[in-house]
């Protein structure tokens, strides 16, 4: 069965369900260190743990895609020669300014890789870029895991 392609949407905050908004707040508490545990964070925002875990990996605050914004892609690649090079080629063709590349030691023939890049000068949208990477032979997963102002 083919894996369903992920799509991303921009949605006004006031249109989002309360559980999604509270999930973002709980994640921010954890990132800032204002909550030491998930339990503490969800209690502070009055959210169930099950709702937090349901949404935590799929909702992120959005910042305008503009110069000075970085994006991080987390990937799982097969441990074969040239796969990471092809991924970097797609990013280079899109004029992404790569800041960091981190690759873990392969385990069971798979390596976790994160690539962080600036969006200034980026040609094409992130959905198209991740789709092109996802279609490469040897790429098992591609997920945008964050973006931030630098």
UniProtKB/Swiss-Prot annotation:
InterPro entries for this protein: ACT-like_dom_sf, ACT_dom, UPF0735_ACT_dom-cont
Record CDD domains: ACT_PheB-BS (cd04888)
Gene3D superfamilies associated with the record: 3.30.70.260
SUPFAM superfamilies: ACT-like (SSF55021)
Name by which UniProt lists this protein: UPF0735 ACT domain-containing protein PTH_1602
Matches recorded under PROSITE patterns: ACT
HAMAP family cross-referenced by the UniProt entry: UPF0735
Residues of the ACT domain: 72-147
UniProt cross-references to Pfam families, sorted A to Z: ACT_4
Highest taxon of source: Bacteria
Family: Belongs to the UPF0735 family.
NCBIfam families: PRK04435.1 (NF003361)
Native species: Pelotomaculum thermopropionicum (strain DSM 13744 / JCM 10971 / SI)
């Amino acid at each position: 069965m083919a894996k369903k392609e992920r799509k991303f949407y921009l949605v006004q905050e006031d249109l989002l369900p309360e559980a999604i908004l509270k999930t973002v707040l709980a994640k921010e508490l954890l990132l800032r260190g204002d909550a030491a545990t998930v339990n503490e964070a969800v209690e502070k925002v009055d959210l169930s743990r099950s709702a937090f875990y349901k949404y935590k990996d799929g909702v992120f605050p959005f910042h305008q895609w503009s110069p000075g914004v970085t994006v991080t892609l987390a990937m799982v690649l097969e441990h074969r020669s040239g796969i990471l090079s092809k991924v970097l080629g797609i990013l280079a063709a899109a004029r992404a300014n790569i800041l960091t590349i981190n690759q873990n030691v392969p385990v069971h023939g798979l390596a976790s890789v994160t690539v962080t890049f600036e969006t200034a000068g980026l040609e094409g949208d992130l959905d198209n870029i991740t789709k092109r990477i996802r279609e490469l032979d040897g790429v098992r997963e591609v997920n945008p895991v964050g973006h931030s102002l630098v």
